[in-house]
Swiss-Prot record:
Entry's Gene Ontology BP terms: intracellular phosphate ion homeostasis; mRNA 3'-end processing; positive regulation of telomere maintenance via semi-conservative replication; regulation of pericentric heterochromatin formation; regulation of siRNA-independent facultative heterochromatin formation; sno(s)RNA transcription; termination of RNA polymerase II transcription; termination of RNA polymerase II transcription, exosome-dependent
Known partners and oligomeric status: Component of the cleavage and polyadenylation factor (CPF) complex.
Name of the protein in its database record: RNA polymerase II subunit A C-terminal domain phosphatase ssu-72
A Pfam match: Ssu72
Gene symbol of the encoding locus: ssu-72
GO cellular component, one term: chromatin
EC identifiers of the protein: 3.1.3.16
Amino acid sequence: MSAVDTPTGAASSSKPDQNEQNGQNGGREDSGGFKLKFCTVCASNQNRSMEGHLRLSLANYPVISFGTGSLVRLPGPSITQPNVYKFNETSYDSIYRELEAKDPRLYRANGLLNMLGRNRQVKWGPERWQDWQIGMPRTKHKDDKGADGMEGGVADVVITCEERCWDAVIEDLLNRGSPLNRPVHVINIDIKDNHEEASVGGRAIVDLADSLNKIAAEEREKVGASAFDSGSVGARSGFDERVPDVLAEWQERWPNLPATWTLAWF
């Protein structure tokens, strides 16, 4: 897998499944009602996680996104000359302007400027998963797309876009020691690291979100909104038990996007 979470070459030949044509291709009217809270994760919080973040927000889901790398790494003029930035300190807009000043032809041709242009419309800058203060109010992120509903700083489902990111998230959650005792589903969808596959992956993520949200709403109605929304283990058990079946059905619709799942704890 690419060590850089941005486009690194020609797109793969895999095509989206026929079932993706279900209204998952952009903004849509909000049908109202309950919405699960999502978090998307990749290495640098640039390409795949941001495509997922944008699409989930357009589908009216509360969503945040992160990267798991030590630094933000973007392709440079050669493989030995990447552009490197710090998480939480560098805005997408400043990265855009820096690369545009360095070599506009190169960074327009390889898709970085287009990607960064999208990202700066979604939120301020790349955030690192390991620095996320889970359960703390996200008061500085009210202008991010998908921020409504994420004010409490917790998610119901974390979707990673690469196995190493899934491993990093699971390891970090174990190290934190589950202080909130709140269940969270961590799902990895293996999305190849280029623009085309990120776009396909984004649609697949929304398809999965819709399926998960449907069963969550059903279980919430059974146990009561207050109990379910509290995130307590007992109130969420019905939903938790149904997730593997939903994921198996989703996998049949998206056979080119291998998925892995586990139940973890905040």
